[in-house]
C-alpha cells in the first residue's frame, strides 16, 4: 500500500492524502451472500438518547460478515480477492474453502490472491493461518486474538496492529499488545499469524473537516468552549482554563487518572499499558 497526495487545487484539497488501494483486487463486494444491510443509529439507543457522542451522517454502507472465529479447522482455503471494507481500517480477504464455503477474514500483511490459508492446530506458521496460542512459537506476531475460547477474535484487529508472543506458562500465554500492555491469555484461545494489513492507514492525512463527516464523524466540541450548564469546565469570562483538571461532561477525570473498572480481569494484566 502507498499514500497518494493530491494537487492543491483548493484549500480543502491542499493537505488531503489517499491510499493508493493497489492491494485491492475487487471494486465491489465479490460475495453477495456475505453482506448485510447496516442501519445507522447516529449514536442513539432505542430510546433515542445519545449513548455515543460525535457520531452521525456519513456515507451509506453494507456490513461485511467477517469470520473472527476461524473455526473451520483443517480445511484449506484459497484467497480469491482482497477487498475494501468501509466498516474497518483493515482490508478483508475473501476465502474459497475446499468444501465450497466462502468466508471473509481480516487480510494480514503479505497475503495475496492465490495464497492458501488454513486454521487448526496443525497449520503452518505463515500469515493468515489461525491456531491456538499454545501452538505458536515465541516471538511470533499475531492478530485477531480470542479472549474467551470459541468467542472469536476480540483484540488486535485494526490496520497495522499486532501482538507478540512473549512467554508460555502453564495454561496461559503472555502477549505484548499494541498498547505495550502485557497480558495473559488462555493458551487454548486462537490467534491469527501476522500483523493486520493496510499498515500506513494512520499516516493518511484527512485534510478537511468534511471528509470526517463522510466517515460518519461529527464535530468534537471542547468542554471549555461550552456553557456551565453543559460541561464542568464550561463558562468563565473570556478564554478560561476550565478551572479544574480535564474531565468528561459527567465529571470523570480524563488525564493521568486510572478509570478502569473491570477488576475481574485485572489478574490477567501483568503490566499495564504505558502512555
Curated annotation (Swiss-Prot):
What GO terms fall under cellular component here? large ribosomal subunit
- GO annotation (BP), single: cytoplasmic translation
The record's GO molecular-function terms, alphabetically, read:
rRNA binding; structural constituent of ribosome; transferase activity
The reply on keyword RNA-binding is yes
Q: Where is this region: Disordered?
A: 221-275
Q: Which UniProt keywords apply?
A: Ribonucleoprotein, Ribosomal protein, RNA-binding, rRNA-binding
Show the Pfam families listed in the entry: Ribosomal_L2, Ribosomal_L2_C
Physiological role: One of the primary rRNA binding proteins. Required for association of the 30S and 50S subunits to form the 70S ribosome, for tRNA binding and peptide bond formation. It has been suggested to have peptidyltransferase activity; this is somewhat controversial. Makes several contacts with the 16S rRNA in the 70S ribosome.
Give the UniProt family note: Belongs to the universal ribosomal protein uL2 family.
Query: Which PANTHER family does this chain map to?
Result: LARGE RIBOSOMAL SUBUNIT PROTEIN UL2M (PTHR13691:SF5), RIBOSOMAL PROTEIN L2 (PTHR13691)
Query: Quaternary arrangement and interactors, per the entry?
Result: Part of the 50S ribosomal subunit. Forms a bridge to the 30S subunit in the 70S ribosome.
What is the protein named? Large ribosomal subunit protein uL2
Task: State the organism named in the record.
Answer: Desulfosudis oleivorans (strain DSM 6200 / JCM 39069 / Hxd3)
Amino acid at each position: 500500500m502507498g499514500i497518494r497526495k493530491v494537487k492543491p487545487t483548493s484549500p480543502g484539497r491542499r493537505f488531503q492524502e489517499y491510499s493508493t488501494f493497489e492491494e485491492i483486487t475487487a471494486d465491489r463486494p465479490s460475495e453477495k451472500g456475505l453482506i448485510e444491510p447496516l442501519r445507522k443509529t447516529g449514536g442513539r439507543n432505542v430510546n433515542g438518547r445519545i449513548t455515543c457522542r460525535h457520531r452521525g451522517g456519513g456515507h451509506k454502507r453494507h456490513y461485511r460478515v467477517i469470520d473472527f472465529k476461524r473455526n473451520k479447522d483443517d480445511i484449506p482455503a484459497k484467497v480469491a480477492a482482497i477487498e475494501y471494507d468501509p466498516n474497518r481500517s483493515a482490508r478483508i480477504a475473501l476465502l474459497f474453502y475446499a468444501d465450497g464455503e466462502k468466508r471473509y477474514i481480516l487480510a494480514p500483511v503479505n497475503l495475496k490472491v492465490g495464497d492458501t490459508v488454513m486454521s487448526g492446530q496443525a497449520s503452518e506458521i505463515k500469515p493468515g493461518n489461525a491456531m491456538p496460542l499454545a501452538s505458536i512459537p515465541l516471538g511470533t506476531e499475531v492478530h485477531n486474538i480470542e479472549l474467551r475460547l470459541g468467542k472469536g477474535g476480540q483484540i488486535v484487529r485494526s490496520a497495522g496492529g499486532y501482538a507478540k508472543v512473549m512467554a508460555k506458562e502453564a495454561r496461559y500465554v503472555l502477549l505484548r499488545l499494541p498498547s505495550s500492555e502485557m497480558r495473559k491469555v488462555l493458551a487454548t484461545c486462537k490467534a491469527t499469524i501476522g500483523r493486520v494489513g493496510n499498515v500506513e492507514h494512520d499516516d493518511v492525512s484527512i485534510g478537511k473537516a468534511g471528509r470526517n463527516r463522510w466517515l460518519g464523524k461529527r464535530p468534537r466540541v471542547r468542554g471549555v468552549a461550552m456553557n456551565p450548564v453543559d460541561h464542568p469546565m464550561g463558562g468563565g469570562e473570556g478564554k478560561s482554563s476550565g478551572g479544574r483538571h480535564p474531565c468528561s461532561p459527567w465529571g470523570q477525570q480524563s488525564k493521568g487518572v486510572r478509570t478502569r473498572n473491570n477488576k475481574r480481569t485485572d489478574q490477567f494484566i501483568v503490566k499495564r499499558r504505558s502512555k
